[in-house]
Amino acid sequence: MSFFKKKLSKGKEILSKSNLKTHTSSNASLSIDDLNRFGFSLNPVLWCLDHQQGLLAIVSSTNRIYIYGKQHVQSVIVPDCSTIVHIALCAAYLIVIDSRNTVLSYPLMKHRDLSKPAATYFLKQKVTCTVTDPTIDWVFFGMSDGSVVPWDVTRHCLGKFKVPNLYVPRHEEWRMMGYSYAPVPGKLSPVVSVQIHPKDLGVILIAYPDGVVLYSIRTDEVIRFYELEYAPGSTAAVLSPHNYRRPIVKGIEWSPWGDHFVSYYTDSTFAFWDVDQEYPVQVRNFVDSNIHTYTPMQRNPPKTELEPIRSMRWCCCEDPTVSFILMLGGLPKEAPVKGISLFSYRNLPAKKDVETFAEFFANPNSQRFFPFIDIPPVRDMLVIPSSSPHYNGSHNPKNLLLLSEDNSLSLLDISTGNISNMSLSIPPSLCFLASDFRVIAFQTVTKKVWNQIEDTISVNSHYSCLFGGSPSPGYLKKLDERNLLITSTGLSLSIWDISQGFMNPSLCVNLDFSSVMRKHLTPSAFITTASFSTYNPEFSCADSFGRVIVCKRKNHKENLPAQLANGIYRLDDTLVLEGTLHAQYYIDLKRGRVTLNQMSNIGFVCIGYQDGGITIIDMRGPHILCNTSISELGLERRGKPDPDFLTSAEFVVMNPKGSPSSIYVVTGTYRGMTLLFRIDPSSSGRFSAYFESSRQLDIKNIYKICSLTQDGQIATATGSSLQSVGYPLPQEVFLVYIGDSGISVFNKINNQVGNLDWRKPVCCRAALVLSTVSKHMGSVVCVNSDLSVNWYSLPNLREERKMQLPLDIDKNRLKEGDILGNGDYIFPTLGAHELAFGCVLGSGRTLANLAPMMLITHNASHVPPRPSKSLWNWLLGEQSTSAEELDILLGGENRAESKVHTLETPKVISARPAESVKQPLTPVPSMTSQSAQSYIPPRRQQQQKGFFAQINDHLAQRGNMLGGIENTMDDLEEMSAEWANEIKDSLAGTKKDLILSGLKSYIP
């Protein structure tokens, strides 16, 4: 339902009351529309990335699960369980494990009530880790009793296969031998980590605190144990905090080629292993290498305390043989700067012996360090791959998502090592988790203005790290105006068009002022306020050091003069495109923090400072029309320790004393004083500002001033209203002052026609709303500190109606939000990093009416081919387990049928954007809303042959190939023998000729 209609008028920039009226009757009932939530509730705890579907799942401290995709794709699941400890995305399912060992399975491939899981299963043991692969329908659970059990995702049950605790017999052997590191009887080592071989699904690495085990699912036996023990007197033994020389395993990572792996330990060391050797190839830490061996000539370095290694990932480039290791932590504790270490290994050595690889891992091709300078210390990192979903999710990553200790997020560009602007790459809601993210303004502009600044989007366009999901088109709620949500991160500004109910990155203008202000850059500077002109593509923003940046569209015909006034500084940017927004100049009067930044619609800017300063700027010069202060005007109250300062301003054309109309600037202060300035043209063609009068109101903190005429039209100064300057006005202008403790309505400046005082609750935000449900001139809608919304009619200020905001809005942070004249509001919620978006001119919509978004857009059964072992290894007898073989090994010959049904003839729709696709992915069908609710993507068909029959087929195929090679070698041998015989005959003939010719030379 719309409460506004469009009215044609001669002036295209007039927003009158008739523009905002509807065809509804005056007694129509109104209620609040709760439209959407932007941001993230409280703090992130866990995360999981499904690169096959391009989805990212993050668990918040409120036990909510947010699932993100491309653009503004977002779904929220609130499971009915205890604290979530593990999540996994596999085969278009979300697997959730809580602290009570309950497994919940949520299907994501269709629209349904995601609050109810498809299956619930109760485990007997605690899950310590999970791992999966995009080509299988299984999730491996590492258990607290040391076992590994597979979870059948599509059958919602555990598999028949189980890996027992592989260290139980080994512990018994240690106790029999009397080793000091043997655990006490009855103590079971839990599983620390499980990793699937990057080229063989039938081989897994299982990490226990005591060591690492290479296990074959195909043969159901242990291949090898890997246990690190330092040599006596070695560097690692000297630095080790343990009495015995065996560190505790903390994690493992496969190499991309699968012949090596790395394990890292609680004493900040990490070891490289060859899968064919029981002894480490190389053991090192951040400082030194070969720290596990001892030689009589070596000198132990001074003891350096290292911080623990928090995480380690072994990634590869487009070519899997070119790899690098990312290590979070492991630095010396006395290091002044923390960061992430990168060890690059570009080319594998041709010689495969242990000594060569020991030297290879000891001396990386390059070693880089990414310091945490502008962000807090990091406690976890997430690799976002850009190519295939294989190689344990670390194939050619471009970005790294960092979770800091203060629960903020940052995005690191791996190629440059710099912190990237998150609004350009990740979902908008996650931008709220940036450490320096701020919501600084919420206001309305005309559609014409938005169309003019929309060209700036292409300058810093959004490129999403995620590609999953199908975004909802939203709803067209506004016709001739746009709601702008303005946010900042440091000196970067983001302008979001949220008129359709979403923060869509494709409708976001990103401006970065750090580059143009590099000569004037102050460390830790950030933008605090911003003000847009409603009818012109220009705005101003202030930073934390009192500088005001003025931005306009680039126009080669409008150039700044060669010499500017004192306090105004030029910002030159030669790379600005014609017709795009850019920072033209900034104002720095050295007066402290900016308390008011008000951009007019007629080319003026009013600035208020913390010291009581008042500055009016004419953008046509630019010129400083007025630079004074409240104390210089003699209006400062005696006995007050802190100076009064401006908090609001309004530009209006009026004739307060019956004289010809002029341009006036009406300002309000924190202590309830109003100041009136008149702007007149001078003989030189410029404008001049003069102080006229002041008045003390019984209102504290006047944060909003509205002007309107007697017939209910907005009287804010616009380009068309300047035509009436110098002439009598046809209607009287009313001024409405709104503060924390009351409202006052004046006409003729000093004639008070309405007054309303309140103490509790406090009016935190208010707006002038013109609608058919309001009588006379309109209504003032006040949002109070108890979340109530009161409507007061103008000019008599009688209460019309009362509403209640959603209860999850934070009543203590209402001043951080705002409400607009069209009834839309933005207020922070109790979620700390979340905003509630709604409208007081609504019909009672709730979040349950929000259109759902499709998360699964790629067929889960069509995955890019998984890397496999080389042909030479295959000829030598090594077998790779396929996904179908793994289904039989884990689920048995009589595995139950999948509970996922298929459609017979799907219709193909567009897949992932071409610029972000490295390998083709098959999309799912295009569906209507009705068929989408029953659609589930097809899964792999059940393998018909038995396991032993498949082995026989593989052996026969290998025998045929080996037989062909044998025949080829026989042919080569025969050809070589014939060629040797020919050479032998030729040499014999040549020798005979030489002998005969020599004999002839002696015969006379």
Swiss-Prot record:
Q: Please name the SUPFAM superfamilies in this protein's record.
A: Tricorn protease domain 2, WD40 repeat-like
Is Metal-binding found in the keyword set?
no
* Coiled-coil stretches: none
State which residues carry a glycan (glycosylated).
N27, N392, N418, N421, N627, N859
An example GO biological process term is: establishment of cell polarity
- Where would you find this protein in the cell? Membrane
State one Pfam family annotation. Answer: Lgl_C
Q: Which PANTHER family match?
A: LETHAL 2 GIANT LARVAE PROTEIN, TOMOSYN, ISOFORM C
By sequence similarity, the record places it as follows: To yeast YPR031w.
Instruction: Please report the name of this protein according to its UniProt entry.
Output: Uncharacterized protein C1F3.03
Question: Which species expresses this protein natively?
Answer: Schizosaccharomyces pombe (strain 972 / ATCC 24843)
